[in-house]
Structures are given as structure tokens and as C-alpha cells.
């Protein structure tokens, strides 16, 4: 759908890795910890198609002002999620793949060159903050470099905390379901068990757990065993 209509895409934290980082119309993560261009696009869009989104406070912020210039189409397989946090204009309850396939078959190709150029220009001028030059290790630079070393096949698991958001922001996800994190419940100590489960399911792919001091403290006893 995005390719046919030249529609930009942004993701919530739970949606990261569903779109390859190098896709030309991908704007990155939205919300409190998101990229400036993703938030700019949402604020200035005249149509927002939300797929499986719950519009958490980290995404929507002030829910009464979220994308208030746009018509919102909310697609979700669970009817109870529709307009739960942010009121939508059109609700479509069902399987996202089937609904989007129907969209693709019904809509004509579009370009939206002016809108696309505006976002490209904005992204070029205002991006995520880059680590400062110096001899100190910056977590953002560490995460960015980690992707270079691991490549696109790795699955990244995080615990909960600042490291989680830095990993969400700066790691570059190329394959679906390569970012695993407890974003909704925010359960510290989640990471080790999740990483073991992921490795069991994908024994031939690199699996890396990125954790913080609090979450590490919750799992020290398991590591000692």
C-alpha cells in the first residue's frame, strides 16, 4: 500500500522491525521517544491510517490534540481497541493483511511528490541527536555500532528502561520481528527469559539481550545458577 500510494510509514515501539529501516518512505518511531520527522508527519497529515495501534500515552501524548488535522482510519482485529484512547473517524475491524489487500486492489497509484519532498527535507535538516565527539562511550553510538557488527539477521531483545528506548531509536531493524521488548507492560527483568525463548525459536540467528542495571539486578540469581 505504501509503495502504491507513496504513503510514508512510522511505527510505535511495538511495531519496530515491521518495516525495514532503509525503506525510503520509513520515517522511524513515533511519539515521545520518536524521530522528529515521524511526529512532524503525524501532526501535519490529513489522513492517518493506524494499523493495530493502541495510541498509548507515549505515542499520542495529549490525545485530544493527536493528529487533530487528520481523518483517522483505525484498523484492528479487536473491536474493543477501536477509539479506546484516540477517537477515529473510520473503524475497520478485521485482519490487517486482508483489509490492506482490499485497499491495494481498489486504489490507484499516487505520487504525493510535494508531501514526500517536504518530509525528506525535514528529515535531512532535523534528525535524531547524534553522539558528541569525544573519548567517552555514548550509548547511542554503541547501539548504532552494534548493528554494524551484528548485521541484519540478529534479533534484539531489551529489558525496560532508558537502554530500551535508545535501542529502539538507534538500532536499525531490517527484518520483521527482530525487536522484542516489553513495551506495553514495561516489565523489568523480562529480557533474559525472552531472549532464551527467542533463541530457542531461532537457534540459527544471533540473539542479543540489551539490559540495564535494574533489570540485570532482577536476573542476577538466574545467571548465578
Predicted regions and their residues:
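General beta-strand structural signal in soluble alpha/beta enzymes
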Residues: 10-12, 50-51, 94, 134, ...
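Thiamine diphosphate
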Residues: 37-47, 52-56, 165-225
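Conserved catalytic cysteine-centered active-site region
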Residues: 10-23, 172, 202-204
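Active-site diphosphate/adenylate-binding microenvironment
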Residues: 120-204
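Glycine-rich, acidic loop regions that bind phosphate or pyrophosphate groups
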Residues: 15-118
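Catalytic alpha/large subunits of respiratory electron-transfer oxidoreductases
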Residues: 1-12, 46-47, 152
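Short, solvent-exposed amphipathic alpha-helical segments in soluble enzyme
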Residues: 1-6, 63-68, 90-91, 170-175, ...
Amino acid at each position: 500500500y505504501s509503495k502504491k500510494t507513496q504513503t510514508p510509514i512510522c511505527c510505535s515501539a511495538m511495531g519496530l522491525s515491521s518495516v525495514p529501516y532503509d525503506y525510503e518512505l520509513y520515517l522511524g518511531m513515533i511519539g515521545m521517544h520518536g524521530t522528529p520527522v515521524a511526529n512532524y508527519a503525524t501532526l501535519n497529515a490529513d489522513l492517518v491510517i493506524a494499523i493495530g495501534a493502541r495510541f498509548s500515552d507515549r505515542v499520542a501524548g495529549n490525545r485530544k490534540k493527536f493528529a487533530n488535522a487528520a481523518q483517522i482510519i483505525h484498523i484492528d482485529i479487536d473491536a474493543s481497541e477501536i477509539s479506546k484512547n484516540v477517537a477515529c473517524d473510520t473503524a475497520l475491524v478485521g485482519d490487517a493483511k486482508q483489509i490492506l489487500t482490499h485497499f491495494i486492489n481498489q486504489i490507484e497509484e499516487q505520487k504525493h511528490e510535494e508531501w514526500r519532498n517536504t518530509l525528506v527535507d525535514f528529515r535531512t535538516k532535523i534528525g535524531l541527536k547524534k553522539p558528541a565527539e569525544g573519548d567517552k562511550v555514548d550509548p547511542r553510538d554503541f547501539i548504532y555500532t552494534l548493528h554494524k557488527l551484528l548485521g541484519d539477521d540478529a534479533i534484539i531483545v531489551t529489558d525496560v528502561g532508558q537502554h530500551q528506548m535508545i535501542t529502539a531509536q538507534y538500532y536499525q531493524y531490517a527484518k520483521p520481528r527482530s525487536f522484542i521488548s516489553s513495551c506495553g507492560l514495561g516489565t523489568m527483568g523480562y529480557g533474559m527469559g525472552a531472549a532464551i525463548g527467542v533463541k530457542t525459536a531461532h537457534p540459527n540467528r544471533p540473539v542479543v539481550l540489551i539490559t540495564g542495571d535494574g533489570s540485570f539486578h532482577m536476573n542476577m540469581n538466574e545467571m548465578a545458577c
